[in-house]
Amino acid sequence: MIPCRAALTFARCLIRRKIVTLDSLEDTKLCRCLSTMDLIALGVGSTLGAGVYVLAGEVAKADSGPSIVVSFLIAALASVMAGLCYAEFGARVPKTGSAYLYTYVTVGELWAFITGWNLILSYVIGTSSVARAWSGTFDELLSKQIGQFLRTYFRMNYTGLAEYPDFFAVCLILLLAGLLSFGVKESAWVNKVFTAVNILVLLFVMVAGFVKGNVANWKISEEFLKNISASAREPPSENGTSIYGAGGFMPYGFTGTLAGAATCFYAFVGFDCIATTGEEVRNPQKAIPIGIVTSLLVCFMAYFGVSAALTLMMPYYLLDEKSPLPVAFEYVGWGPAKYVVAAGSLCALSTSLLGSIFPMPRVIYAMAEDGLLFKCLAQINSKTKTPIIATLSSGAVAALMAFLFDLKALVDMMSIGTLMAYSLVAACVLILRYQPGLSYDQPKCSPEKDGLGSSPRVTSKSESQVTMLQRQGFSMRTLFCPSLLPTQQSASLVSFLVGFLAFLVLGLSVLTTYGVHAITRLEAWSLALLALFLVLFVAIVLTIWRQPQNQQKVAFMVPFLPFLPAFSILVNIYLMVQLSADTWVRFSIWMAIGFLIYFSYGIRHSLEGHLRDENNEEDAYPDNVHAAAEEKSAIQANDHHPRNLSSPFIFHEKTSEF
């Protein structure tokens, strides 16, 4: 009996959820100094990195041709689905932590730690790789003199390490980490300057492309491409067409456009850094959703315009995969424009680097504040109001990686952390919107201050009616003809269906990735399995759609629920399956290190665990409440609010201005 009780207690520790109360949304140790424009600049700068100067040429030449503009449109729509889920959580829970916090308040502590641990990895590798790219781009402007010097005098001949240590990248990371430690407002100002220069350069590229472009480059005939291939002595493709495709707007067909969209999806990664600023924004409930959606829109317009200008200036099959824009300008006779492009590329890399460094210490700070990482990492500088220990320590780790390692083999690990976070946030939105408690619990503030209250139909329900609905048992009738109000049974059903949906999507992704040849050959087993997966997917989504949602309103809510989050989960898991086996092995090693930290330290020092244990002790020994009051106040020193541990209630918008 005792081992079973211990196992049950251990399992409850893994799924305990963080309680975020209304008062704690304003309570922060950080400095609230960021505006909506600061968030837009941060999102655009982080997302619109150097990829806009390189990715368009690579995808247009190999996958999409001129239809790369459609590829970016599809990728933008897929990214917006994830962005909208982040936007709703940013409005509901405007606290530091991003996807880590959103997972913690919805599905529990273990999944939250997994999410946060992988976000840390993504930001560290992203910071290191962008710093080395910045160093390499600057070295190109100096005719590679820095690299030649370091290769001569500091060459490293060890497997897995870089060819030479990158001192320049180390200095760059430490400089920006120091800037962030100095203050968020100063960092935001520097970011806005670099982002503005980047946008101006991209506008120049678009205008120049449309002026010097030729629509004929979108209408190249197949015969012309065959002649080009024959003169270059290139063998034809398997279907008899040129290696450059069939010509026209979609030379590689719609499948090529979709393949390009999968690659372009990663060009929109980075907006999630906005969600880590919840405790540093003046009005986070409105600024975070606006910042996320606006930054994604601006980035799409930039990617769309640059890719259109590039393919109009130069035939897609002649594009240079590494430096498409400078080569394209030389092709149209504007050679000196390459210096403008180089300046824009350095500014883009600078904002991208700042966008990687900025959220990294904030996720670490949030996890340390909750007790899941070492408490010293939650220390806040009294003058600058920044997590100085987390900033400097994470910057030092990123600098060390940039100094020693060849990061090309590790970059794919960034994708796992990001895509997993996207998937979990979408799943959390589904689970949260069908919880029963959000409509019945009345916040301790007036409707006028609350801004958006519950609907009259819900608030007019008597307590006895609500209790009757909560006690309603499960049956097939409640599955297909549920009540008007969410119950605990309907919420549990949705939670189960969301989990089952994730495993179903995983199976569908594996089938369409590794069994695609069997599907194209119309083999019976593959078609039957594909049909089964699709039917179950549609049935589960429709069943979730039939369940009653809570009536609570916030500043921003994901539209088209549950279809949009479900499709976001499908896209993200499919892209995760595309990653190589070596990437998953490295990911497993990183997770093993994380689990060692969590099960040896985090699970025992969790703030939620201490507060729940204290609450249980008060229930068991009510006569000792006064004797334990002093200890309780010490534990709640960082909380400053009463807690309702029986409900995973997440408070809605509080429209006060900071």
UniProtKB/Swiss-Prot annotation:
<feature type="topological domain" description="Cytoplasmic">
    <location>
        <begin position="185"/>
        <end position="192"/>
    </location>
</feature>
<dbReference type="GO" id="GO:0006865">
    <property type="term" value="P:amino acid transport"/>
</dbReference>
<feature type="topological domain" description="Cytoplasmic">
    <location>
        <begin position="550"/>
        <end position="557"/>
    </location>
</feature>
<feature type="topological domain" description="Cytoplasmic">
    <location>
        <begin position="1"/>
        <end position="37"/>
    </location>
</feature>
<dbReference type="GO" id="GO:1902475">
    <property type="term" value="P:L-alpha-amino acid transmembrane transport"/>
</dbReference>
<keyword id="KW-0597">Phosphoprotein</keyword>
<feature type="transmembrane region" description="Helical">
    <location>
        <begin position="340"/>
        <end position="360"/>
    </location>
</feature>
<feature type="glycosylation site" description="N-linked (GlcNAc...) asparagine">
    <location>
        <position position="227"/>
    </location>
</feature>
<feature type="topological domain" description="Extracellular">
    <location>
        <begin position="579"/>
        <end position="582"/>
    </location>
</feature>
<protein>
    <recommendedName>
        <fullName>Cationic amino acid transporter 2</fullName>
    </recommendedName>
</protein>
<feature type="transmembrane region" description="Helical">
    <location>
        <begin position="583"/>
        <end position="603"/>
    </location>
</feature>
<dbReference type="GO" id="GO:0005886">
    <property type="term" value="C:plasma membrane"/>
</dbReference>
<dbReference type="GO" id="GO:0097638">
    <property type="term" value="P:L-arginine import across plasma membrane"/>
</dbReference>
<feature type="topological domain" description="Extracellular">
    <location>
        <begin position="512"/>
        <end position="524"/>
    </location>
</feature>
<dbReference type="InterPro" id="IPR002293">
    <property type="entry name" value="AA/rel_permease1"/>
</dbReference>
<feature type="modified residue" description="Phosphoserine">
    <location>
        <position position="24"/>
    </location>
</feature>
<feature type="modified residue" description="Phosphoserine">
    <location>
        <position position="464"/>
    </location>
</feature>
<feature type="transmembrane region" description="Helical">
    <location>
        <begin position="193"/>
        <end position="213"/>
    </location>
</feature>
<feature type="transmembrane region" description="Helical">
    <location>
        <begin position="525"/>
        <end position="549"/>
    </location>
</feature>
<feature type="transmembrane region" description="Helical">
    <location>
        <begin position="411"/>
        <end position="431"/>
    </location>
</feature>
<keyword id="KW-0812">Transmembrane</keyword>
<dbReference type="GO" id="GO:0030054">
    <property type="term" value="C:cell junction"/>
</dbReference>
<feature type="modified residue" description="Phosphoserine">
    <location>
        <position position="647"/>
    </location>
</feature>
<feature type="topological domain" description="Extracellular">
    <location>
        <begin position="408"/>
        <end position="410"/>
    </location>
</feature>
<feature type="transmembrane region" description="Helical">
    <location>
        <begin position="64"/>
        <end position="84"/>
    </location>
</feature>
<dbReference type="GO" id="GO:0150104">
    <property type="term" value="P:transport across blood-brain barrier"/>
</dbReference>
<feature type="transmembrane region" description="Helical">
    <location>
        <begin position="38"/>
        <end position="59"/>
    </location>
</feature>
<feature type="modified residue" description="Phosphoserine">
    <location>
        <position position="455"/>
    </location>
</feature>
<keyword id="KW-0325">Glycoprotein</keyword>
<feature type="transmembrane region" description="Helical">
    <location>
        <begin position="387"/>
        <end position="407"/>
    </location>
</feature>
<dbReference type="InterPro" id="IPR004755">
    <property type="entry name" value="Cat_AA_permease"/>
</dbReference>
<feature type="modified residue" description="Phosphothreonine">
    <location>
        <position position="28"/>
    </location>
</feature>
<feature type="transmembrane region" description="Helical">
    <location>
        <begin position="558"/>
        <end position="578"/>
    </location>
</feature>
<feature type="topological domain" description="Cytoplasmic">
    <location>
        <begin position="361"/>
        <end position="386"/>
    </location>
</feature>
<feature type="transmembrane region" description="Helical">
    <location>
        <begin position="491"/>
        <end position="511"/>
    </location>
</feature>
<dbReference type="GO" id="GO:0015179">
    <property type="term" value="F:L-amino acid transmembrane transporter activity"/>
</dbReference>
<feature type="topological domain" description="Extracellular">
    <location>
        <begin position="60"/>
        <end position="63"/>
    </location>
</feature>
<keyword id="KW-1003">Cell membrane</keyword>
<feature type="transmembrane region" description="Helical">
    <location>
        <begin position="290"/>
        <end position="309"/>
    </location>
</feature>
<feature type="topological domain" description="Extracellular">
    <location>
        <begin position="310"/>
        <end position="339"/>
    </location>
</feature>
<feature type="topological domain" description="Cytoplasmic">
    <location>
        <begin position="604"/>
        <end position="658"/>
    </location>
</feature>
<feature type="transmembrane region" description="Helical">
    <location>
        <begin position="105"/>
        <end position="125"/>
    </location>
</feature>
